[in-house]
Amino acid sequence: MSKKRRLFTSESVTEGHPDKICDQISDAILDAILEKDPNARVACETSVTTGLVLVSGEITTSTYVDIPKIVRDTVREIGYTRAKYGFDADTCAVLTSIDEQSPDIAMGVDKALEAREGQMTDEEIEAIGAGDQGLMFGFACNETKELMPLPISLAHRLARRLSEVRKEAILPYLRPDGKTQVTVEYDENGKPVRIDTIVVSAQHHPEITQEQIERDIKEHVIKPIVPAELIDENTKYFINPTGRFVIGGPQGDAGLTGRKIIVDTYGGYARHGGGAFSGKDPTKVDRSAAYAARYVAKNIVASGLADKCEVQLAYAIGVARPVSISIDTFGTGKVSEDILIEVVRNNFDLRPAGIIKMLDLRRPIYKQTAAYGHFGRTDIDLPWERTDKAETLKEQALALAKQ
C-alpha cells in the first residue's frame, strides 16, 4: 500500500443493542408526548440491564402518556419477546423517576435574552433561547449519494440488514443484538477505492454453528449491501470473531441513552460536540442545532460549492443567536469560507426557534432516527436531509465571489 493511501473505520449497531434500546425508548416517549403536546419540554434518559428498564429525566407537559406501556411496546417491537433472550417486553420491570424542567432553565428558553433586552420583537422569533450552551457539528461529503462518509453509510446499512433478515425470518436463529464495522481504503486523492475489512457480530441461538453463521451472514447480509466492485480478494471478514454470541442485549451489557453519539452521526469521520440526541425535545440545541448544521453542510455539498464540508455552531444558554458559525471545506471549496458563512447567515435561521420552524421539528419524528443513524437516511423522509437550498446557495455564493 502506498504511504499516501489510508484506512478509515466506522461502526454501527442494531436496534437490539442495549444502548440503542435506550435511545429508542427515550425517543418513543418523546414522540408520544409531542404528538399530544408539541410545546412540551422533554429530557428523557433510559437505562436498561437484565430484566429492568429505568426511565428518568425532566419532562414539562400538559399531557399524560403511559410510559411503562411505551417502554414495553418499544422493547417488543425491537424483538425482545422471550425470557430466554435475557430480556422480555412483558416481564421486565419498568421504573420511572420524572421531574419537571428546572425553572431556571425554562426562564432562559421561554423568552430569549435578545427579546428580553428589547433587541427583537416577539413577531420576529418565537422567543426561544438555546436550552443550553454548547457546540454542534454538521458534516457532508460527496462519497455517497446521500452525501455521507462511505464507512458509516455501509456500517448502518449492514446493521439494518442484520435486523431485516432476523425479522423477516430469513435467518430466524438470529437474536436482536448486533454490531457492524467497515474499514474503507482511500486513495492518494482521498477517494474511497475498496473495502479492507468488514466486521459483523450477530447475537444468535445457541445451537447454530459458527460455520453456518459465517456462510449466512456473507450471503444474506454482506452480499446484498456492499457493492461488489469495492470487494477484492484481500478484503478481510470477521464474523462473530469470538466464535459465540448467545448472551447479548441488556443481559450481556447494561445500556444507556446517549452512549452511541458517533454511531448516530458520522462514524468518527467528522468532529462531534459531545451532546447526544435521543430523548430531547427540539429546544435542546444538542439535537436541533446538530440537525441544522447537517442541513447547512449537506446543501453546501449538494450545491457543488464544496466536496466536503463541516459546519460548527455554538450557543449560550438563553441566547437565541449562535455565538459562532464556522465552516471548513478542507481545501475543497469553490469559494472562500467567509463567503459560505455569509450565504449561510442569509439563508438559514440558526436561532433555536428559527431551526424549529425551518425544519418543522415540533412533531413526533424522532423514534425513527434512534437506530441506524440520524443522517444520510434514505429509508425515511427527514427535513434536515433535504437539499432544497442548494441552488440558492450556489447562485448567491458565486455572485459574491465575483464582487
UniProtKB/Swiss-Prot annotation:
<feature type="binding site">
    <location>
        <position position="45"/>
    </location>
    <ligand>
        <name>K(+)</name>
    </ligand>
</feature>
<feature type="binding site" description="in other chain">
    <location>
        <begin position="244"/>
        <end position="245"/>
    </location>
    <ligand>
        <name>ATP</name>
    </ligand>
</feature>
<dbReference type="InterPro" id="IPR022631">
    <property type="entry name" value="ADOMET_SYNTHASE_CS"/>
</dbReference>
<feature type="region of interest" description="Flexible loop">
    <location>
        <begin position="101"/>
        <end position="111"/>
    </location>
</feature>
<feature type="binding site" description="in other chain">
    <location>
        <position position="17"/>
    </location>
    <ligand>
        <name>ATP</name>
    </ligand>
</feature>
<feature type="binding site" description="in other chain">
    <location>
        <position position="284"/>
    </location>
    <ligand>
        <name>L-methionine</name>
    </ligand>
</feature>
<dbReference type="InterPro" id="IPR022629">
    <property type="entry name" value="S-AdoMet_synt_central"/>
</dbReference>
<feature type="binding site" description="in other chain">
    <location>
        <begin position="259"/>
        <end position="260"/>
    </location>
    <ligand>
        <name>ATP</name>
    </ligand>
</feature>
<feature type="binding site" description="in other chain">
    <location>
        <position position="58"/>
    </location>
    <ligand>
        <name>L-methionine</name>
    </ligand>
</feature>
<feature type="binding site">
    <location>
        <position position="280"/>
    </location>
    <ligand>
        <name>ATP</name>
    </ligand>
</feature>
<dbReference type="Pfam" id="PF02773">
    <property type="entry name" value="S-AdoMet_synt_C"/>
</dbReference>
<keyword id="KW-0808">Transferase</keyword>
<dbReference type="GO" id="GO:0004478">
    <property type="term" value="F:methionine adenosyltransferase activity"/>
</dbReference>
<dbReference type="GO" id="GO:0006730">
    <property type="term" value="P:one-carbon metabolic process"/>
</dbReference>
<keyword id="KW-0067">ATP-binding</keyword>
<dbReference type="InterPro" id="IPR022636">
    <property type="entry name" value="S-AdoMet_synthetase_sfam"/>
</dbReference>
<comment type="pathway">
    <text>Amino-acid biosynthesis; S-adenosyl-L-methionine biosynthesis; S-adenosyl-L-methionine from L-methionine: step 1/1.</text>
</comment>
<dbReference type="GO" id="GO:0000287">
    <property type="term" value="F:magnesium ion binding"/>
</dbReference>
<dbReference type="Pfam" id="PF00438">
    <property type="entry name" value="S-AdoMet_synt_N"/>
</dbReference>
<comment type="function">
    <text>Catalyzes the formation of S-adenosylmethionine (AdoMet) from methionine and ATP. The overall synthetic reaction is composed of two sequential steps, AdoMet formation and the subsequent tripolyphosphate hydrolysis which occurs prior to release of AdoMet from the enzyme.</text>
</comment>
<feature type="binding site" description="in other chain">
    <location>
        <position position="101"/>
    </location>
    <ligand>
        <name>L-methionine</name>
    </ligand>
</feature>
<keyword id="KW-0554">One-carbon metabolism</keyword>
<keyword id="KW-0479">Metal-binding</keyword>
<keyword id="KW-0630">Potassium</keyword>
<dbReference type="InterPro" id="IPR002133">
    <property type="entry name" value="S-AdoMet_synthetase"/>
</dbReference>
<feature type="binding site">
    <location>
        <position position="19"/>
    </location>
    <ligand>
        <name>Mg(2+)</name>
    </ligand>
</feature>
<feature type="binding site">
    <location>
        <position position="276"/>
    </location>
    <ligand>
        <name>ATP</name>
    </ligand>
</feature>
<comment type="subunit">
    <text>Homotetramer; dimer of dimers.</text>
</comment>
<keyword id="KW-0460">Magnesium</keyword>
<dbReference type="GO" id="GO:0005524">
    <property type="term" value="F:ATP binding"/>
</dbReference>
<dbReference type="Pfam" id="PF02772">
    <property type="entry name" value="S-AdoMet_synt_M"/>
</dbReference>
<keyword id="KW-0963">Cytoplasm</keyword>
<comment type="similarity">
    <text>Belongs to the AdoMet synthase family.</text>
</comment>
<keyword id="KW-0547">Nucleotide-binding</keyword>
<feature type="binding site" description="in other chain">
    <location>
        <begin position="177"/>
        <end position="179"/>
    </location>
    <ligand>
        <name>ATP</name>
    </ligand>
</feature>
<feature type="binding site">
    <location>
        <position position="253"/>
    </location>
    <ligand>
        <name>ATP</name>
    </ligand>
</feature>
<dbReference type="GO" id="GO:0006556">
    <property type="term" value="P:S-adenosylmethionine biosynthetic process"/>
</dbReference>
<dbReference type="GO" id="GO:0005737">
    <property type="term" value="C:cytoplasm"/>
</dbReference>
<protein>
    <recommendedName>
        <fullName>S-adenosylmethionine synthase</fullName>
        <ecNumber>2.5.1.6</ecNumber>
    </recommendedName>
</protein>
<dbReference type="InterPro" id="IPR022628">
    <property type="entry name" value="S-AdoMet_synt_N"/>
</dbReference>
<dbReference type="InterPro" id="IPR022630">
    <property type="entry name" value="S-AdoMet_synt_C"/>
</dbReference>
<feature type="binding site">
    <location>
        <position position="253"/>
    </location>
    <ligand>
        <name>L-methionine</name>
    </ligand>
</feature>
